[in-house]
């Protein structure tokens, strides 16, 4: 039985936000968790990334927020700053119409800035364990008004040595509160947390959705970041797709890609979460009607799209997680038709390739990045195919006299070559500039150096000149990363 978000009878503010985000049908984890969350039940959810668990806990969490209150009403504890940022962005979108204030807090960010933000009375805090505990110990954040706690990816926090921090944080929350705990696995220490801090929790277990992709040809191209765009345009020239979707990881990427493709002579439109629903619908209508060749999209903007006839999907940026890859390529190969999906992998993203292959239970074939000569040959072949189609239509009587006159002065090969040259779209080398995106790594590799039984996220307050080595390391990494972006 299909459950839609209308079935949850949410407030008008949340209904508006969910509609804007493109949600229609609830995923299994959402269908089971949201009613329990709204009923104020404690929940243990076993679910992988990509199953929609952020909305599963985020919707009931935001629904219970009182926007008129100046107090912190909910905290979400996440293992990494990347996840904390991602979750806070999702919660902001869900709570936008309700005016729910969301604040992400994590190590590596200036603590003075965080303290100033905390004074602006956020309703929801999303943070990493060590930095949350740091603020508790500094007394810059008080949790006596918290009524909902979410532990996201609890097993990952256990692996990173955060279990003591989590227990300390939960000890500062009122006894009467709701806890939603999400974990892919349930090792003994996580079970102990559930026993100690949860009341008669309901268990929800959902496996990550596996999708059959037998009718989709899947390829990967190993290509450096700076060569991605030329590789994309050459593929478009060679393959000449009827309808193509290009996926970018960020809104900035989508905007820049759309502009660059149009500069190179392709007709492209971009869609992402910052565009109004009306603008997104206009772009989609043009795409369905064939008025544009390429639709450039983020994962969130493309969620729930139902477009028939998509022949090619280009993953310009590798997706955030393997399940998003499955959803992306599922835009093609529909209704029994075959489709083609190509994923650009930078040399430092090979671990993501393996993770995707494990999820789809299928190896991708390697495709060599095409050369400029191959792109020109591809466009010539498109022209030849068009000429053959026109010949087969046998509607050429009006042009026969002019053709005969040409053949009196030139041989047939020269005449045909001139026609092919005239009709062929020459590759456009107009310079374009895209902001480089940092390579995406699997969580296992991102956290490889941080796994131990010790706290890794800053611990408690040790005085203003005595930051933890982890925070110093994170700050150093931030500086290096910032430098690489600006170079």
Curated annotation (Swiss-Prot):
<dbReference type="InterPro" id="IPR000629">
    <property type="entry name" value="RNA-helicase_DEAD-box_CS"/>
</dbReference>
<keyword id="KW-0346">Stress response</keyword>
<feature type="binding site">
    <location>
        <begin position="47"/>
        <end position="54"/>
    </location>
    <ligand>
        <name>ATP</name>
    </ligand>
</feature>
<dbReference type="InterPro" id="IPR014014">
    <property type="entry name" value="RNA_helicase_DEAD_Q_motif"/>
</dbReference>
<feature type="domain" description="Helicase ATP-binding">
    <location>
        <begin position="34"/>
        <end position="204"/>
    </location>
</feature>
<feature type="domain" description="Helicase C-terminal">
    <location>
        <begin position="215"/>
        <end position="375"/>
    </location>
</feature>
<dbReference type="InterPro" id="IPR030880">
    <property type="entry name" value="DEAD_helicase_CshA"/>
</dbReference>
<comment type="similarity">
    <text>Belongs to the DEAD box helicase family. CshA subfamily.</text>
</comment>
<keyword id="KW-0963">Cytoplasm</keyword>
<dbReference type="Pfam" id="PF00271">
    <property type="entry name" value="Helicase_C"/>
</dbReference>
<feature type="short sequence motif" description="DEAD box">
    <location>
        <begin position="152"/>
        <end position="155"/>
    </location>
</feature>
<feature type="compositionally biased region" description="Basic and acidic residues">
    <location>
        <begin position="469"/>
        <end position="479"/>
    </location>
</feature>
<dbReference type="Pfam" id="PF00270">
    <property type="entry name" value="DEAD"/>
</dbReference>
<keyword id="KW-0378">Hydrolase</keyword>
<comment type="function">
    <text>DEAD-box RNA helicase possibly involved in RNA degradation. Unwinds dsRNA in both 5'- and 3'-directions, has RNA-dependent ATPase activity.</text>
</comment>
<dbReference type="GO" id="GO:0005829">
    <property type="term" value="C:cytosol"/>
</dbReference>
<dbReference type="GO" id="GO:0003723">
    <property type="term" value="F:RNA binding"/>
</dbReference>
<dbReference type="GO" id="GO:0003724">
    <property type="term" value="F:RNA helicase activity"/>
</dbReference>
<feature type="short sequence motif" description="Q motif">
    <location>
        <begin position="3"/>
        <end position="31"/>
    </location>
</feature>
<comment type="subunit">
    <text>Oligomerizes, may be a member of the RNA degradosome.</text>
</comment>
<feature type="region of interest" description="Disordered">
    <location>
        <begin position="428"/>
        <end position="487"/>
    </location>
</feature>
<dbReference type="GO" id="GO:0006401">
    <property type="term" value="P:RNA catabolic process"/>
</dbReference>
<keyword id="KW-0547">Nucleotide-binding</keyword>
<dbReference type="InterPro" id="IPR011545">
    <property type="entry name" value="DEAD/DEAH_box_helicase_dom"/>
</dbReference>
<dbReference type="InterPro" id="IPR001650">
    <property type="entry name" value="Helicase_C-like"/>
</dbReference>
<dbReference type="InterPro" id="IPR027417">
    <property type="entry name" value="P-loop_NTPase"/>
</dbReference>
<dbReference type="GO" id="GO:0009409">
    <property type="term" value="P:response to cold"/>
</dbReference>
<keyword id="KW-0347">Helicase</keyword>
<dbReference type="GO" id="GO:0033592">
    <property type="term" value="F:RNA strand annealing activity"/>
</dbReference>
<dbReference type="InterPro" id="IPR014001">
    <property type="entry name" value="Helicase_ATP-bd"/>
</dbReference>
<feature type="compositionally biased region" description="Basic and acidic residues">
    <location>
        <begin position="428"/>
        <end position="440"/>
    </location>
</feature>
<dbReference type="InterPro" id="IPR050547">
    <property type="entry name" value="DEAD_box_RNA_helicases"/>
</dbReference>
<protein>
    <recommendedName>
        <fullName>DEAD-box ATP-dependent RNA helicase CshA</fullName>
        <ecNumber>3.6.4.13</ecNumber>
    </recommendedName>
</protein>
<keyword id="KW-0694">RNA-binding</keyword>
<keyword id="KW-0067">ATP-binding</keyword>
<dbReference type="GO" id="GO:0016887">
    <property type="term" value="F:ATP hydrolysis activity"/>
</dbReference>
<dbReference type="GO" id="GO:0043590">
    <property type="term" value="C:bacterial nucleoid"/>
</dbReference>
<dbReference type="GO" id="GO:0005524">
    <property type="term" value="F:ATP binding"/>
</dbReference>
<feature type="compositionally biased region" description="Basic residues">
    <location>
        <begin position="441"/>
        <end position="454"/>
    </location>
</feature>
<dbReference type="GO" id="GO:0005840">
    <property type="term" value="C:ribosome"/>
</dbReference>
């Amino acid at each position: 039985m299909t459950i839609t978000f209308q079935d949850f009878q949410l407030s008008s503010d949340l209904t508006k936000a969910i509609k804007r985000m493109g949600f229609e049908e609830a995923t299994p984890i959402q269908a089971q968790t949201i009613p329990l969350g709204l009923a104020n039940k404690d929940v243990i959810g076993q679910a992988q990334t990509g199953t929609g668990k952020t909305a599963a806990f985020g919707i009931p969490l935001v629904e219970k927020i009182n926007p008129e209150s100046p107090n912190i009403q909910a905290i979400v504890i996440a293992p990494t700053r990347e996840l904390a940022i991602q979750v806070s962005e999702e919660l902001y979108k869900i709570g936008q119409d309700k005016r729910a204030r969301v604040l992400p807090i994590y190590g590596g960010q200036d603590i003075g800035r965080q303290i100033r933000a905390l004074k602006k009375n956020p309703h929801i805090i999303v943070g990493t364990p060590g930095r949350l505990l740091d603020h508790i110990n500094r007394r810059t954040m008080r949790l006596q008004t918290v009524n909902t706690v979410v532990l996201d990816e609890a097993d990952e926090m256990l692996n990173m040595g955060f279990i003591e921090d989590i227990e300390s944080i939960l000890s500062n929350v009122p006894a009467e509160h709701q806890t939603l705990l999400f974990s892919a696995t349930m090792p003994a220490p996580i079970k102990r947390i559930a026993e100690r801090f949860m009341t008669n929790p309901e268990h929800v277990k959902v496996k990550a959705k596996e999708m059959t992709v037998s009718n989709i040809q899947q390829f990967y191209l190993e290509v450096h970041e700076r060569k991605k765009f030329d590789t994309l345009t050459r593929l478009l020239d060679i393959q000449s797709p009827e309808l193509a979707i290009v996926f970018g990881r960020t809104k900035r990427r989508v905007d820049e890609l759309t502009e660059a493709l149009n500069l190179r002579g392709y007709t492209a439109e971009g869609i992402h979460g910052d565009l109004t629903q009306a603008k997104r619908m206009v772009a989609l209508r043009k795409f369905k009607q064939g008025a544009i060749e390429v639709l450039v999209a983020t994962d969130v903007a493309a969620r729930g799209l139902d477009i028939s006839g998509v022949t090619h999907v280009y993953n310009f940026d590798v997706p955030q997680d393997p399940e998003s890859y499955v959803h992306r390529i599922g835009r093609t190969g529909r209704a029994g038709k075959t489709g083609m999906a190509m994923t650009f992998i930078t040399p430092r993203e090979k671990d993501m390739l393996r993770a995707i292959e494990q999820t789809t239970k299928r190896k991708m074939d390697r495709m060599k990045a095409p050369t400029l000569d191959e792109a020109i040959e591809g466009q010539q072949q498109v022209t030849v195919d068009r000429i053959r189609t026109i010949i087969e239509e046998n509607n050429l009587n009006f042009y026969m006299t002019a053709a005969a006159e040409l053949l009196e002065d030139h041989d047939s090969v020269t005449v045909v070559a001139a026609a092919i040259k005239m009709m062929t779209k020459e590759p456009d080398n107009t310079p374009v500039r895209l902001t480089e995106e940092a390579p995406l790594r699997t969580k296992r590799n991102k956290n490889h150096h941080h796994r131990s039984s010790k706290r890794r996220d800053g611990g408690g307050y040790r005085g203003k000149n005595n930051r933890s080595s982890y925070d110093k390391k994170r700050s150093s990494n931030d500086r290096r990363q910032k430098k690489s972006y600006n170079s």
